[in-house]
Amino acid sequence: MAKHTTVLLDEAVNGLGLKTDGIYVDGTFGRGGHSRHILGQLGAQGRLIAIDRDPRAIETGEALMKEDPRFTIIHGPFSGLAEYIKELGLAGQIDGVLLDLGVSSPQIDDADRGFSFMRDGPLDMRMDPTSGISAAQWLAKADVDDIGWVLKTFGEEKFAFRIARAIVADRTETPFLRTLQLAQLIERLCPKREKKKHPATRSFQAIRIYVNSELEEIHKVLDGALEILAIGGQLSVISFHSLEDRIVKRFIRKQEKGREYPPGLPLTEAQMQHGKTLKSLAKALKPSAEEINENTRARSSVLRVAQKIAEPESE
């Protein structure tokens, strides 16, 4: 199994404001780094529910569940957070939710998962290989406009449509089935703009985000977390690129701002507080230089922490 170093471990767990008898959710179990750290600080009455859609993560979680009765693992996308917690009868009782967004190091390092442009493997990229369509299946059917839009929107790729045209032209003779096949095509088409970044980085990120509906999942899990947190419960979220962080930042700001009224309208103090459901507990936190030196994946990570102060208004 690939070694996985958990990013911002102490900081993200501290962002939950742990109580020894609290009930917490690790929405992105992965290989269990955050979960084990949380369990290490909970007492006998504490409880941790973890979620992951990766079957290999579930195997690790099920082994931990056998060892620790305080721990429960759920197989599914984290967008189902509110539904899972309601089924457990714990809505409104959750003291903290931790989310570590994006793809994990073991997923990238396992060539068979198809996430890596450095290792040859099947062009899959699904977080859950048992569900949805693979990257190869999508690239075989999508047109130039769709591929170009995905690369530009989710990868912020300058050469998005150049790459899209080449994929559509080349696939008529040879379908794109392998990761290095796609990575080498992109490398031929695109100049290396950033010294430490492979030319295929942005395109692989974009296709992965699209195949897994990652940004839509983030919107849903943030809404779900707000719904199931107890008043005073805390949300601790690690993002790994600007698209993720933008969603998290805007969500927290919107919930801090509350209901919007027409400009110039005289408001009471109660009206000014109306609709405010979260307050940010700290400025966005980035890893230390020491952590980045030890784990280069940490370099782009950002942690945001907020606390629930009121129930959201019903629609």
From Swiss-Prot:
The keyword Transferase applies. Specifically methylates the N4 position of cytidine in position 1402 (C1402) of 16S rRNA. Pfam families: Methyltransf_5 (PF01795). Belongs to the methyltransferase superfamily. RsmH family. GO terms for biological process: rRNA base methylation. Keywords: Cytoplasm, Methyltransferase, rRNA processing, S-adenosyl-L-methionine, Transferase. It comes from Psychromonas ingrahamii (strain DSM 17664 / CCUG 51855 / 37). SUPFAM superfamilies: Putative methyltransferase TM0872, insert domain, S-adenosyl-L-methionine-dependent methyltransferases. This is Ribosomal RNA small subunit methyltransferase H. InterPro entries: RsmH (IPR002903), SAM-dep_MeTrfase_MraW_recog (IPR023397), SAM-dependent_MTases_sf (IPR029063). S-adenosyl-L-methionine binds at residues 32-34, 52, 78, 100, 107. It is found in: Cytoplasm. PANTHER family: 12S RRNA N4-METHYLCYTIDINE METHYLTRANSFERASE, S-ADENOSYL-METHYLTRANSFERASE MRAW. HAMAP family: 16SrRNA_methyltr_H. GO terms for molecular function: rRNA (cytosine-N4-)-methyltransferase activity. Its EC number is 2.1.1.199. The gene is rsmH. The keyword Transferase applies.
